[in-house]
C-alpha cells in the first residue's frame, strides 16, 4: 500500500493507520535531545563541591543535603600510627565546626552506607571523599605503617572486604611530603590482602602548599603516575591569592604535567568561588556548601561548568 492510499480508507481506519506510525515520529526527538545533552555535558568541566570538615556521622547527610557531591574528613592517628578519630580540633576555620568527631571505623561504616546503592542511607550524588590525614603527630618513619593500617581499616569497614562496599572515590590527602611512604604502605597492603583492584578507586593529594616541583618529586618516590589531585588554599580566616592555583592548573593542562585535578579551599564566598572557577579549578571546598553550590549554574558559568556525578572519573584530566 502506498503512503497516499490511506486517503482511500474509511476515516476511522485511516486515523488508526496514522496513529500506528505516530509513535515512531515522536520517538526520534528524545534520542536527538539525549545526544545533544551528552555533547553539551562533555564540553562542561565537572565540578566537585567538597564539604569541609565532615567528621560526625550525621554531617554526611547534612552536607550532601546542602549541595555537596563530595566531602572532606579529617583523620587523626594514635601514637602507633592507627587511624583513630575523624577529628579536626582547634584552631580551625572561622565559623567552622572544629570539634565534631567520631571513631574512625564507625565513621567508615556510616560512609559505606551513604555510598552503597540500595542502602536506606544511600546518597547517589556523594561520589568522592577526601581523607585529610593528620600525620603531623607521627614520626616520618611511621608513614608506611600509617598507610598500611589505613588500608586495612578501609578494606574492612568501607569496602566490606571487596564485597559490595562503598562506591565513592577516595583521595588520600597528606600534609607532609616526607610522608610519601604512606602511599606505598597503603598500596602494598591492598595488594597483600588480595584487593589491588581497589586502588582504581584511590587518588592522592599533598596538601602542604609546597612547590609544585617538590610535590612531583614526592610522587616519583612513591611510584605514583596518576590519580593526582592538587590542593591549594588556606583557612577562610585569611586571604590567599590564586597564584599557586594557576601554577597547578598550568601543570594540569600541560602535556607533561602530573596533576589531574585542582581544588581550592576553604571557600565560603560566592565571589571567591567565581574567582576560583575563572582560574580553572575542578573542585571547591566550602564550610557551607549551600552558599556556593549553585554558582556553577549561574548564567555566566553554566555553559562551561556542571556538578560532577559518579559517571565523571575524578582521575581523568578534563580536556575541552
From Swiss-Prot:
Cystine pairs: 92-98, 94-237
Annotated GO CC locations: extracellular region
Active site: 52, 88 (nucleophile)
Compartment(s) where it occurs, according to its Swiss-Prot or TrEMBL record: Secreted
Glycosylation site residues: 297
GO biological process: killing of cells of another organism; lipid catabolic process
One function term, GO molecular function aspect: phosphoric diester hydrolase activity
UniProt keyword Magnesium, yes or no: yes
Record-listed Mg(2+) binding positions: 72, 74, 132
Keywords assigned: Cytolysis, Dermonecrotic toxin, Disulfide bond, Glycoprotein, Hemolysis, Lipid degradation, Lipid metabolism, Lyase, Magnesium, Metal-binding, Secreted, Signal, Toxin, Zymogen
Main localization category: secreted
EC number, as in UniProt: 4.6.1.-
Top-rank taxon, per record: Eukaryota
Protein family membership: Belongs to the arthropod phospholipase D family. Class II subfamily.
Protein name: Dermonecrotic toxin LarSicTox-alphaIB2a
Organism: Loxosceles arizonica (Arizona brown spider)
Amino acid at each position: 500500500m502506498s503512503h497516499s492510499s490511506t486517503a482511500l480508507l474509511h476515516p476511522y481506519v485511516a486515523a488508526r493507520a496514522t496513529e500506528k506510525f505516530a509513535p515512531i515520529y515522536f520517538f526520534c526527538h528524545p534520542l536527538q535531545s539525549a545526544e545533544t545533552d551528552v555533547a553539551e555535558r562533555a564540553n562542561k568541566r565537572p565540578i566537585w563541591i567538597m564539604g569541609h570538615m565532615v567528621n560526625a556521622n550525621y554531617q554526611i547527610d547534612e552536607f550532601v543535603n546542602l549541595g555537596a557531591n563530595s566531602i572532606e574528613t579529617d583523620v587523626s592517628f594514635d601514637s602507633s600510627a592507627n587511624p583513630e578519630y575523624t577529628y579536626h580540633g582547634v584552631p580551625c576555620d572561622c565559623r567552622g565546626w572544629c570539634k565534631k568527631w567520631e571513631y574512625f571505623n564507625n565513621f567508615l561504616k556510616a560512609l559505606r552506607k551513604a555510598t552503597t546503592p540500595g542502602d536506606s542511607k544511600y546518597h547517589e550524588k556523594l561520589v568522592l571523599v577526601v581523607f585529610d590525614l593528620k600525620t603531623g603527630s607521627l614520626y616520618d618513619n611511621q608513614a608506611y605503617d600509617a598507610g598500611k593500617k589505613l588500608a586495612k581499616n578501609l578494606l574492612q569497614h568501607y569496602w566490606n572486604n571487596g564485597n559490595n562496599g562503598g562506591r565513592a572515590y577516595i583521595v588520600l590527602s597528606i600534609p607532609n611530603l616526607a610522608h610519601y611512604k604512606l602511599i606505598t604502605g597503603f598500596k602494598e597492603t591492598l595488594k597483600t590482602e588480595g584487593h589491588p583492584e581497589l586502588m582504581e578507586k584511590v587518588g592522592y593529594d599533598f596538601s602542604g602548599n609546597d612547590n609544585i616541583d617538590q610535590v612531583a618529586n614526592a610522587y616519583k618516590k612513591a611510584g605514583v603516575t596518576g590519580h593526582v589531585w592538587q590542593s591549594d588554599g588556606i583557612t577562610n580566616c585569611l586571604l590567599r591569592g590564586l597564584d599557586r592555583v594557576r601554577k597547578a592548573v598550568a601543570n594540569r593542562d600541560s602535556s607533561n604535567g602530573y596533576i589531574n585535578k585542582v581544588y581550592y579551599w576553604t571557600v565560603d564566598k560566592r565571589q571567591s568561588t567565581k574567582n576560583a572557577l575563572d582560574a580553572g579549578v575542578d573542585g571547591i571546598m566550602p564550610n557551607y556548601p549551600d552558599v556556593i553550590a549553585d554558582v556553577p549554574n549561574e548564567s555566566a558559568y553554566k555553559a562551561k561548568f556542571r556538578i560532577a556525578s559518579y559517571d565523571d572519573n575524578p582521575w581523568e584530566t578534563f580536556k575541552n
